[in-house]
A protein has these predicted regions:
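Soluble sensory domains of the PAS superfamily and closely related sensory modules
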Residues: 79-85
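Residue-level detector of buried hydrophobic side-chain packing
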Residues: 62, 88-90, 142
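Solvent-exposed edge beta-strands and adjacent loop segments
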Residues: 1-68, 120-136
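Short, conserved charged micro-motifs
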Residues: 69-76
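Short beta-strand and beta-hairpin "edge-sheet" elements
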Residues: 96-150
Length: 161
C-alpha cells in the first residue's frame, strides 16, 4: 500500500526541545551510498573486485515557504549562518499518523502510530528564493552525518482476518 506525502511533518530536536518546521513543501533525506573498497590483487587480469565500504552521507534538502515570523525558519537560518558545527536530529513523520515526537531529558520518543525517518546533520545553507508571482521559499540544505533510520508504523492489533 502506498502512502501520501500530504500530511508529512518535519521536526528537529534543537536546544533540548522538539520543534516542528511548518511550511514544508518538499523534503528529500538524501542518500548514504556505500564507498567501494578495492580488493583486487595482482593475479586478477580481467576485472577489479570490490567490497562494500563505509557510507558517505549526502545532503538532505527541505524546501519551505520561508516566513520571517516563523521561529523555526529563523532558527534554521541562524543555524546555517552560525560559526558552530552543532549537529541537530531531524525527524520526518509520515502521513500515516499525526502524533508528534516527544522529548524528556534529551531522549526523543517517536510514537509507534506513525512511520518515521530520522537522521542527524547540520544546517549548511538557507538560501532565499524570490520570484515573480510566488511565495518566498528556501531550499534548506542539511549535511547528514551518519546513517538514517527508518521506523515503520506498528500495525494496529486486533484487526484479524
Amino acid at each position: 500500500m502506498s502512502v501520501l506525502a500530504q500530511g508529512t511533518q518535519v521536526f528537529m530536536l534543537a536546544a533540548g526541545a522538539i520543534v516542528r518546521i511548518p511550511g514544508a513543501t518538499a523534503f528529500n533525506p538524501g542518500g548514504n551510498p556505500r564507498d567501494q573498497v578495492e580488493e583486487t590483487d595482482l593475479e586478477d587480469t580481467t576485472s577489479r573486485r570490490y567490497k562494500k565500504g563505509l557510507g558517505t552521507p549526502g545532503s538532505a534538502s527541505l524546501t519551505v515557504n520561508a516566513d520571517p515570523q516563523e521561529p523555526a525558519h529563523v532558527q534554521l537560518y541562524e543555524m546555517a549562518n552560525s560559526k558552530g558545527e552543532d549537529k541537530v536530529k531531524f525527524f520526518v513523520g509520515w502521513s500515516d499518523g499525526t502524533e508528534p515526537p516527544t522529548v524528556a531529558t534529551q531522549t526523543v520518543s517517536l510514537p509507534t502510530t506513525r512511520t518515521w525517518f530520522e537522521f542527524e546533520g547540520y544546517v549548511s545553507d538557507f538560501p532565499m528564493d524570490f520570484a515573480t508571482n510566488s511565495l518566498v521559499s528556501s531550499q534548506v540544505t542539511i549535511q547528514r552525518s551518519g546513517d538514517g533510520k527508518w521506523t515503520p508504523k506498528t500495525p494496529a492489533s486486533g484487526g484479524g482476518e
